Amino acid sequence: MSLRLNDLKPALGASSSRARVGRGIGSGLGKTAGRGHKGSFARKGGGKIKPGFEGGQTPMQRRLPKIGFRSRSVANTAEVLSYKLDNLEPGEIDFASLRLAKLVPSTAKKAKIVKKGRLTKVFVLKGIESTAGARAMIEATGGSFQE
C-alpha cells in the first residue's frame, strides 16, 4: 500500500476527541461547563480585559503625571558624523549632496554635523547645522559655514 496525502491520519491514541461541555453532571463538565460560578470569566466573551484595566482601580497610566514630548525636529534631523565627510570630495557640501552620498536618510528634512574622529579635507558647508565641536574642527581644517 502506498502512502498518499489524502490517506494520512494521526496514529492510534495520538489524538482525543473534543471535550463536550455542559452535557450533564456525569461528564464532569456539566452545569457550569468548567467556567466556575459568576464573574467575567463565566460569561460569554469573558476574560477579554482591556490592556491597562485594573478592575475599576484607577489605572497606572492615569495615576502617573503626563510629562515631556517627542520633538519633531529631532525626528526630522539626521546626524552626520564628521569623519564620514572625509569620504566626500573636498569643496561645497549642501543637504542634497549629503543625501546623494547616502549619509542622510530620505526621511530627514535637515542634517547636523556631529564631531567624531578626525577631518583632513576642507569643506564649505551650506545650510547645514553643526555642533560647536564639529564647527571648530571644520574651521580648524580651513573649512567654513554658509547659511
Swiss-Prot record:
Gene: rplO
Name the UniProt record assigns to this protein: Large ribosomal subunit protein uL15
Entry GO MF terms: rRNA binding; structural constituent of ribosome
Function in brief: Binds to the 23S rRNA.
UniProt keyword Ribonucleoprotein present: yes
Residue spans of biased composition, Gly residues class: 23-33
A Pfam family: Ribosomal_L27A
Entries under InterPro entries matching the protein: Ribosomal_uL15 (IPR030878), Ribosomal_uL15/eL18 (IPR021131), Ribosomal_uL15/eL18_sf (IPR036227), Ribosomal_uL15_bac-type (IPR005749)
Subunit and partners: Part of the 50S ribosomal subunit.
Annotated organism of origin: Xylella fastidiosa (strain Temecula1 / ATCC 700964)
Transmembrane parts of this sequence: none
Sorted UniProt keywords: Ribonucleoprotein, Ribosomal protein, RNA-binding, rRNA-binding
Positions of the UniProt region annotated as Disordered: 16-63
Protein family (similarity comment): Belongs to the universal ribosomal protein uL15 family.
